[in-house]
From Swiss-Prot:
Changing V52I: Decreased E1S transport. Belongs to the organo anion transporter (TC 2.A.60) family. This is Solute carrier organic anion transporter family member 2B1. SUPFAM superfamilies: MFS general substrate transporter (SSF103473). Changing Q59A: Decreased E1S transport, no change in cell surface expression; no change in Km value and decreased Vmax value for E1S transport activity. Decreased taurocholate transport. The gene is SLCO2B1. The lineage of its organism: Eukaryota, Metazoa, Chordata, Craniata, Vertebrata. Changing S66T: Decreased E1S transport. Residues 1-38, 319-342, 679-709 are annotated as: Disordered. Changing H475Q: Increased high-affinity transport of E1S; decreased low-affinity transport of E1S. A conserved histidine residue in the third transmembrane domain (His-136) might play an essential role in the pH sensitivity of SLCO2B1/OATP2B1-mediated substrate transport. Transmembrane domain 1 (TM1) may be localized within the substrate binding pocket. Residues 70-88, 141-185, 256-273, 389-408, 461-564, 623-655 are extracellular.
Length: 709
């Protein structure tokens, strides 16, 4: 048997010089005693603090590349004609490969070189990020109207009300789609699904191996702080992803193949598509660089010196013969595949893959019988469902609800929401360490944080903008006759059914899908100092024939986006107070040998019950609020207009539902912990008089038989 970290109460051994030379590939030769730690001169990589730093940077880069898709989800929808349900499914495919392997990799992590496995996974994540950009390079240039973007005057003319004989030729319509066009669409979408799956597979070893590695070799009192720092730095990844998305989406999607005459779109145009693919290249490079140090960390490293000194001081007064006998690994017979300790089941470390598959269902069921483990995981499932839906669709929600650009929405989220998440995680970790919170204290902190989060979520139902009037869609034709989608005023026009070039009547604040649907037959460009403004004139369907302005109507309540996001950020910070204490409830509730497996089971449930279904659930709910769909080759593509009031109620309502579930679970956790604490004190008070009486009978120099206090 090679050197291993023993149960609580044993001093960990340090590999000898021969083993150190081959560390990570071979175990220590059986029977050889390890030298004292000061006899070994460890390299700079034999430092758990350095590992915490490197792992924080890697998880930051990993979440940056996975979070970048969420920052550009609405842009990808417009570029490839996807519904919110499909884009939510695309985002959740990150978890498919991860879920299929997480438990097995977590268990067999005790046999492999964990840092190197983390490095290999990071390399796969970087390659998946590069694959994610491939659809951009194999697709045709983006067409934002029925004409080529290389001819701006033709672009303006294509949307005018013109007789059928003089109308410009349109691009392939819904009834004129070739099989090649549909096949190409399916191919590029399929590539993105494969890339997302590989992204999840590569991330399998990163978090569970890193958490268990830190908790194995860090001082017990430092572990909460280290994990708090790890999670806090990690959460900067999505924040950087949204900041990167804000920059990239200000660039036109085909920046690498811009036409000579430029384009007629501006960033405020609803047809604008930013360079979503460019951020994946940058994030993939960051992950590849962060993976390099992991190939130099050892398989095992000595515990921190404070841990060794602490154990030497307390071993003599806390380790009873009964405890040593209970924790001794020699108590397990060679044929046993599992053993029960402290309510959880530990799998023997010498199982084969087939044996592991056979014994895992029983281990899983017995693990879930532990009430604290089950309730904490269920509460984290609710929190993760809320976080997955919010992270995936909050940028799109802000765009639609407050009529702001995708770039500005990402900037606000990156500057407000994610810093608050970091603050919440750090404060939670510091409170656990400074207050020396035990299980009951951790449970109380989790419940308090979620109750406050739920309270500050109530005003979100009432902060938002109603949908502006759209002729023929949301406009009441009974109040204003002649403004339906195909009125008699535009019968002579040859308006494309699938056209989309919105214009706004400033006097009535009514929006039309195209200038043709407003009956406009001409256009003018007014040059200004900073930009040019396009007006469409001679509009037969507009009241008094007023000119209409190119672009959607501006929202009258866009200023509410900042108060809305401040409340969201405050709720996120309060919810993240529970992050570190809930993890400590799981890590401190299992044996050291069970930690990797317990974390693996935890993440398996989070992915199966939260990160996989939640984006699809939120996307489906968003799709039900759509009032006008774009069509592509006869199929429903991207949504162009939503019912904003219904969108707000359903999106925030889902968030409120998951927060309520988390509050209920944490309340049950606290109740169970208090009951267990009460029973333990009662048992201790009852057993103390019996022990004292037995000591008097046995004499001062004898110990009571079968004492397990």
């Amino acid at each position: 048997m090679g050197p291993r970290i023993g149960p609580a109460g044993e001093v960990p051994q340090v590999p000898d010089k021969e083993t150190k030379a081959t560390m990570g590939t071979e175990n220590t030769p059986g029977g050889k005693a390890s030298p004292d730690p000061q006899d070994v001169r460890p390299s700079v990589f034999h430092n758990i603090k350095l590992f915490v730093l490197c792992h924080s940077l890697l998880q930051l880069a990993q979440l940056m590349i996975s979070g970048y898709l969420k920052s550009s989800i609405s842009t990808v929808e417009k570029r490839f004609g996807l519904s919110s349900q499909t884009s939510g499914l695309l985002a959740s495919f990150n978890e498919v490969g991860n879920t299929a392997l997480i438990v097995f990799v977590s268990y067999f992590g005790s046999r492999v070189h964990r840092p190197r496995m983390i490095g290999y996974g990071a390399i796969l994540v970087a390659l998946a990020g590069l694959l994610m950009t491939l659809p951009h390079f194999i697709s045709e240039p983006y067409r934002y109207d029925n004409t080529s973007p290389e001819d701006m005057p033709q672009d303006f003319k294509a949307s005018l009300c013109l007789p059928t004989t003089s109308a410009p030729a349109s691009a392939p319509s819904n009834g004129n789609c070739s099989s090649y066009t549909e096949t190409q669409h399916l191919s590029v979408v399929g590539i993105m699904f494969v890339a997302q799956t590989l992204l999840g597979v590569g991330g399998v070893p990163i978090q569970p191996f890193g958490i268990s590695y830190i908790d194995d070799f860090a001082h017990n009192s430092n572990s909460p702080l280290y994990l708090g720092i790890l999670f806090a730095v990690t959460m900067m990844g999505p924040g950087l992803a949204f900041g990167l998305g804000s920059l990239m989406l200000r660039l036109y999607v085909d920046i690498n193949q811009m036409p000579e005459g430029g384009i007629s779109l501006t960033i405020k145009d609803p047809r604008w598509v930013g360079a979503w693919w460019l951020g994946f290249l940058i994030a993939a490079g960051a992950v590849a660089l962060a993976a390099i140090p992991y190939f130099f960390f050892p398989k095992e490293m000595p515990k921190e010196k404070r841990e060794l000194q602490f154990r030497r001081k307390v071993l003599a007064v806390t380790d009873s013969p009964a405890r040593k006998g209970k924790d001794s690994p020699s108590k397990q017979s060679p044929g046993e595949s599992t053993k029960k300790q402290d309510g959880l089941v530990q799998i023997a470390p010498n199982l084969t893959v087939i044996q592991f598959i056979k014994v895992f269902p029983r281990v899983l069921l017995q693990t879930l019988r532990h009430p604290i483990f089950l309730l904490v995981v269920l509460s984290q499932v609710c929190l993760s469902s809320m976080a997955a839906g919010m992270a995936t669709f909050l940028p799109k929600f802000l765009e639609r609800q407050f009529s702001i650009t995708a770039s500005y929405a990402n900037l606000l989220i990156g500057c407000l929401s994610f810093p608050s998440v970091i603050v919440g995680i750090v404060v939670g970790g510091v409170l656990v360490k400074r207050l020396h919170l035990g299980p009951v204290g951790c449970g109380a902190l989790c419940l308090l944080g979620m109750l406050l989060c739920l309270f500050f979520s109530l005003p979100l139902f009432f902060i938002g903008c109603s949908s502006h009037q759209i002729a023929g869609i949301t406009h009441q034709t009974s109040a204003h006759p002649g403004l339906e989608l195909s009125p008699s005023c535009m019968e002579a026009c040859s308006c494309p059914l699938d056209g989309f070039n919105p214009v706004c009547d400033p006097s009535t604040r009514v929006e039309y899908i195209t200038p043709c649907h407003a009956g406009c037959s001409s256009w003018v460009v007014q040059d200004a100092l900073d930009n040019s403004q396009v007006f469409y004139t001679n509009c037969s369907c507009v009241v008094e024939g007023n000119p209409v302005l190119a672009g959607s109507c501006d929202s009258t309540c866009s200023h509410l986006v900042v108060p809305f996001l401040l409340l969201v950020s405050l709720g996120s910070a309060l919810a993240c107070l529970t992050h570190t204490p809930s993890f400590m409830l799981i890590l401190r509730g299992v044996k050291k040998e069970d930690k990797t497996l317990a974390v693996g089971i935890q993440f398996m449930f989070l992915r199966i019950l939260a990160w996989m279904p939640s984006p699809v659930i939120h996307g489906s709910a968003i799709d039900t609020t759509c009032v006008h769909w774009a069509l592509s080759c006869g199929r429903r593509a991207v949504c162009r207009y939503y019912n904003n009031d219904l969108l707000r109620n359903r999106f925030i309502g889902l968030q409120f539902f998951f927060k309520t579930g988390s509050v209920i679970c944490f309340a049950l956790v606290l109740a169970v912990l208090r009951q267990q604490d009460k029973e333990a004190r009662t048992k201790e008070s009852r057993s103390s008089p019996a022990v004292e009486q037995q000591l008097l009978v046995s004499g001062p120099g004898k110990k009571p038989e079968d004492s397990r206090v």
